[in-house]
Amino acid sequence: MSVGRLWSGLLLLLLFFCSRSSSCGLSTHVEIGHRALQFLQLQDGRINYKELLLEHQDAYQAGTVFPDAFYPSICKQGKFHEVSESTHWTPFLNASIHYIRENYPLPWEKDTEKLVAFLFGVTSHMVADVSWHSLGIEQGFLRTMGAIDFYDSYSEAHSAGDFGGDVLSQFEFNFNYLSRRWYVPIQDLLRIYDNLYGRKVITKNVIVDCTYLQFLEMHGEMLAVSKLYSTYSTKSPFLVEQFQDYFLGGLDDMAFWSTNIYRLTSFMLENGTSDCNLPENPLFISCDGRKNHTLSSSKVQKNDFHRNLTMFISKDIRKNLNYTERGVFYSTGSWAPESVTFMYQTLERNLRMMFTGNSQTALKHVSSPSASYTLSVPYARLGWVMASADLNQDGHGDLVVGAPGYSHPGRFQIGRVYIIYGNDLGLPPIDLDLDKEAHGVLEGFQPSGRFGSALAVLDFNKDGLPDLAVGAPSVGSGQLTYNGSVYVYYGSQQGRLSSSPNITISCKDTYCNLGWALLAADADGDGQHDLVISSPFAPGGGKQRGIVAAFYSHPRRNDKESLTLDEADWKVNGEEDFSWFGYSLHGVTVANRSLLLIGSPTWKNISRMARSSHQKNQEKKSLGRVYGYFPPNRQREITISGDKAMGKLGTSLSSGYVRVNGTLTQVLLVGAPTHDDVSKMAFLTMTLHHGGATRMYELAPEKTQPALFSTFSGDRRFSRFGSVLHLTDLDDDGLDEIIMAAPLRITDVTSGLLGEEDGRVYIYNGMHTTLGDVTGKCKSWMTPCPEEKAQYVLISPEASSRFGSSLVSVRSKERNQVVVAAGRSSWGARLSGALHVYSFSSD
């Protein structure tokens, strides 16, 4: 049988299996299980469960997807749908625990170890589905995705999200860890189901056939499903942007909850279930005598969106099965994806040359940073946020960097903040491992608190020394409250920060996510910076309306003081549910008055008629809006609204001084990174979905509303041009350079069909800014042309690293530097993040 015939059949199977049902998510669940295992540490008991799971990856990975095996109609016409449903809930886990304890006492033989590994994978799937599908909880991933991108339709979000998550996983992640064989404990499963139901409900052949289909599908996804990236990216910007990071049901949150259920499962395997509370919903299991009363623990039907599907599976797809006494192994044999990978890579290279050419790098391209800083801990999110300030008061700019995903074994996503001091020549000009060579480190102490998600430097207690505020928005995740906290560390005469927080600010509201963003800005009119805190996910009087609050700096701030959000000196809320008010913050002085700008990128323009008649399709989704306040006044003075659905105006904000047609002008930049634009290639036109755009407004004291001066646009679909904005003077001419990032940009114009992300950062000289469509006036045959108009273009040194996910400028006596974060770089460790330093001078 030819490889081509077999893979044609397998891809056909994949197409029908996933695109017409909602039972997919294989790649997503395998990835969650892989991440959960990375930092697993179960110290109590007689078994080293991490070693057991690492040894039996074949069973563990099969378990992570098993609960969905009997949902799709291709599996025996869907007759065993209810068996899959029951496998998602606590009674199945309880039956499995009792079965193992009654039949296989310690020490376990290898087949029993495989059964245990398989069960751990199943439990990961259980808790992941609860937060992903919002089962018994509010504001899980798909519920929020539906509210923002699908007119509040959960069913549409479900249909796009389950398989879309797999597409995104295969496009963004390397699955080189996937086992080439899987093990399913058939005989043990039959007996567990007998005990659970009290009768026979399924046969050996059904389990074998349906789990083997999952095995085939998983390897089929490895081959080609990433090529559907453009389709699913168009459907949901939320899916692309929040898939890993969303606080309740993002990949990292689901991995955190997997580690929790592993701890409980190991306890029950060794001690029984008598000391445990076992509600129907596995997310609420507890074995410490405490119950979570915050949210409902009732069972909710997981999957009811499957369509009928019947198809013939080609007999050419030969079953590579090896039965044992208690189970069965599935193997790829000679038809593994690796056997045809070379063919696809060669085709991609040849076609990519057609679309991108092989010309020499343009002179304005900067492809090599002067230094790169990394970590050796995976998933750390190094560079999620950065700040620059002279912390040690030596006259040189220093760099402060957040890594909210930083973990230790047994301490998942506690987060870290790193400090790197500058000198006359700027930041260290050599590559660094920040865990070993950073000048200062602060570490979070709450499980999955994501300490380091936001940073602000200010003199909070007005003692003349810089203090550091750090956001940890997921504090309370273990209780499913996600209240969040902000910690303030006081500076000292020695130039060092306190080793523990001097001030803690907390929020009592569930899903408050306090500390998602921080800003140092004057909020009381005394000319000194105050602490501005925001959370776009906070209730704000509804659901995810968002809040922004300010705490004034003053010398009466006591050491070890605890504050709550209710004690804020100034506070405003968002207007609409899921409008994400406070997603971005920016402070600027206009005519000696402090203007606070607040972005609300998912704001909708809901007409009164649509609101009264509940006609959701009359809304324009995610237009975005920017609000301007002159604190301490709480009255809104400025409003800038988006005009394109899904454009998300207000995602990013920055301001500075440039020359516009020769006139010195104070300007405001507002990013709309998912704005659609039109590209022209000779006589052809193409819509650049989510290519991104940035508006430049004049900030004139005599005008009540900023006047639109110029626009900039990206040149690739889905590139998120303008998602990060910054203005700073790099050449010491008194004018700010305009810096714009496109972290999801793809080199070729096929938007993922032939290439990977290779984000770019564009630097425009502040001396030569023009009115109108800046990137639309092109000499080349293609528009827009953001590269043609730029003075410098910083090129990502690593594919698929989200180069440009954040950036900051650092000043020293000899040079000015730009630090660009690649938030998903794998240079130091898998998806750990990296910082790239670029130096500029006035010469």
Curated annotation (Swiss-Prot):
Keywords annotated in UniProt: Glycoprotein, HDL, Hydrolase, Lipid metabolism, Repeat, Secreted, Signal
Glycosylation, residue list: N94, N271, N292, N308, N322, N483, N502, N592, N605, N661
FG-GAP repeats: 368-429, 435-498, 500-560, 564-625, 635-695, 707-773, 791-843
InterPro entries with a match to the protein in the record: FG-GAP, Gprt_PLipase_D, Int_alpha_beta-p, Integrin_alpha_N, PLPC/GPLD1
Entry GO MF terms: glycosylphosphatidylinositol phospholipase D activity; phospholipase D activity; sodium channel regulator activity
Disulfides per UniProt: none
Subcellular location: Secreted
Annotated signal peptide: 1-23
Assembly information from the UniProt record: Monomer.
Family label: Belongs to the GPLD1 family.
Name of this protein: Phosphatidylinositol-glycan-specific phospholipase D
Lineage start: Eukaryota, Metazoa, Chordata, Craniata, Vertebrata
